[in-house]
From Swiss-Prot:
Family: Belongs to the class-I aminoacyl-tRNA synthetase family. Glutamate--tRNA ligase type 1 subfamily.
A single MF term (Gene Ontology): tRNA binding
Function: Catalyzes the attachment of glutamate to tRNA(Glu) in a two-step reaction: glutamate is first activated by ATP to form Glu-AMP and then transferred to the acceptor end of tRNA(Glu).
Alphabetized InterPro entries for the sequence: aa-tRNA-synth_I_cd-bd, aa-tRNA-synth_I_codon-bd_sub2, aa-tRNA-synth_I_CS, aa_tRNA-synth_I_cd-bd_sf, Glu-tRNA-ligase_bac/mito, Glu-tRNA-synth_I_codon-bd_sub1, Glu/Gln-tRNA-synth, Glu/Gln-tRNA-synth_Ib_cat-dom
Record EC number: 6.1.1.17
Compartments, record wording: Cytoplasm
Name of the protein this chain belongs to: Glutamate--tRNA ligase
Catalysed reaction, written as an equation: tRNA(Glu) + L-glutamate + ATP = L-glutamyl-tRNA(Glu) + AMP + diphosphate
Transmembrane parts of this sequence: none
Length: 477
């Protein structure tokens, strides 16, 4: 496909939503697959709600996901003269007209139409104003909006994903393209931008289907060839309603803070509404680019399932090298304030991660799993200790294993296991009667990685100290 040009055009009226990220990703994959151009356009004409903070969040979120753009960002507020120029052109052609109706008048006529069971479209009152009436409105200080003259008949377009879609023009009515304050409406600005930026494919959510006929009227009024349209399925919550905050986290920034990998979120979002030919679920970004095909996008909505995202994140964490995992988890580890930065031992941390990597579902979980590798003063839970130390001779056996382990010249998992099993055999006790209490002694947890591997990473000195402390704790019960 030659000279593909697509865009993502967020409004900076909120933080980057996973739905916007989903649309951005599909545009980006389409551009990269076809060696085309991906453009970022900031639609900031909602002056009351647009903020710099939201804009920066959107830009940083796209960068974090790796969705870098080739052109932009372009800003609609910097193009107001351009929109006015094209609106004036339509006025001159007689394809648009000034509308002096006030919001109150429009609302009254809308209610009247609904009461008469008619569609509440504009009644073209201002299309037929005399020069004298216009002059009177001007003297009253009314500032006119500009409406497009909608042609009669039907509007049909072919959607790449949904096939042929048809609209009755009379159901739409003449709509405003420039507001009375000189700001263009969404549909007008979008068409001018897409045309002047040479957009070849408009790939967006299905909630924009109803905007398409209005945009086609504008293309036709100028005699321009419209781009191809592809309307993606929306993301829904597990209850099949539109994804919103009540379903949990919806902002890309929050997923970053929770310790999700960008490549995992990209992998997951790509599979919402698109089915690759290959029957698997874990993909690299490079594989997604190679396989992406708009024709395999479904009409069915994508159900955003955090449990599935978590599973995909787990798989991507397991693919990381220990060095990569160390770099990515370190900011979360630092938040726990278990050590002074100048005392941080990278080599030791890599050993810790070799035990925890398989257990991490998110990067942030390092704070949940790694505490006992950095905190020596474990606060044992009495009920847990009583549960795992039911045998009255547990303190005695722990003293014995402490003595045995203190004499090991090589403090390896293999030697630790062999010596413990030998002691258990000699004393005719199940190994679990030693393993479970020792695990609690070393970690203050009842589950975790292999006990002997934990002891090896902690090292001889820490292991023996914790055993001694635990033995003394048992004597107080």
């Amino acid at each position: 496909m030659d000279n593909v040009r697509v865009r993502i055009a967020p409004s900076p009226t909120g933080y980057l939503h996973v739905g916007t990220a989903h649309t951005a990703l599909f545009n980006w994959l389409f551009a990269r697959h076809n060696k085309g151009t991906f453009i970022l356009r900031i639609e900031d004409t909602d002056l009351a709600r647009s903020t710099k903070e939201y804009e920066e969040n959107i830009i940083e979120g796209l960068k974090w996901l790796g969705l870098y753009w080739d052109e932009g960002p372009y800003y609609q507020t910097q193009r107001l003269d351009l929109y006015r120029k094209y609106a004036d052109e339509l006025l001159k052609k007689g394809l648009a007209y000034y509308c002096y109706c006030t919001p109150e008048e429009l609302e009254e006529r809308r209610k009247e139409a609904l009461a008469q069971k008619k569609p509440p479209r504009y009644d073209r009152k201002c299309l037929y104003l005399s020069d004298e009436e216009r002059a009177r409105y001007e003297r009253e200080g009314r500032k006119p909006a500009i409406r497009l003259l909608v042609p009669e008949g039907k509007t049909v377009f072919n959607d790449i994903i949904r096939g042929e879609i048809e609209f009755n023009n009379e159901d739409i009515g003449d709509f405003v393209i420039m507001k009375s304050d000189g700001i263009p409406t969404y549909n007008f600005a979008v068409v001018i931008d897409d045309y002047t930026m040479g957009i070849t494919h408009v790939i967006r959510g299905e909630d924009h289907i109803s905007n398409t006929p209005k945009q086609l009227f504008i293309y036709n009024a100028f005699g321009w060839t419209p781009p191809e349209f592809a309307h993606l399925p929306l993301l829904l919550g597990p209850d099949r309603s539109k994804l919103s905050k009540r379903h949990g986290v919806t902002s890309v920034t929050e997923y970053k803070k929770m310790g999700y990998l960008p490549q995992a979120l990209v992998n997951y979002l790509a599979l919402l509404g698109w089915t690759p030919e290959e029957n698997r679920e874990i993909y690299t970004v490079e594989e997604l680019i190679e396989l992406f095909d708009l024709r395999r996008v479904t009409k069915n909505p994508g159900i955003f399932d955090v449990t599935k995202l978590e599973w995909i994140n787990t798989q991507h964490i397991r693919r990381l090298s220990l060095e990569e995992l160390a770099d990515l988890t370190y900011p979360f580890l630092k938040e726990a304030e278990w050590f002074k930065e100048e005392n941080f031992n990278k080599e030791y941390y890599l050993k810790v991660l070799s035990l925890l990597q398989e257990r991490l579902k998110t990067l942030a979980q390092i704070k949940e799993y790694a505490d006992y590798f950095f905190v020596d003063d474990l606060d044992y839970d009495v009920e847990t200790v009583k549960k795992v130390c039911k045998h009255p001779d547990t303190p005695l056996y722990l003293e014995k294993i402490k003595d045995v382990w203190s004499q090991l010249s090589e403090f390896t998992a293999e030697n630790l296991e062999a010596s413990l099993k030998k002691l258990a055999e000699e004393n005719q006790i199940p190994t679990k009667n030693l393993v479970h209490p020792i695990r609690v002694a070393l970690t203050n947890k009842t589950v975790g990685p292999g006990l002997y591997e934990i002891a090896e990473v902690l090292g001889k000195e820490k292991t023996l100290k914790r055993l001694e402390k635990f033995i003394q704790f048992l004597k107080t019960l």
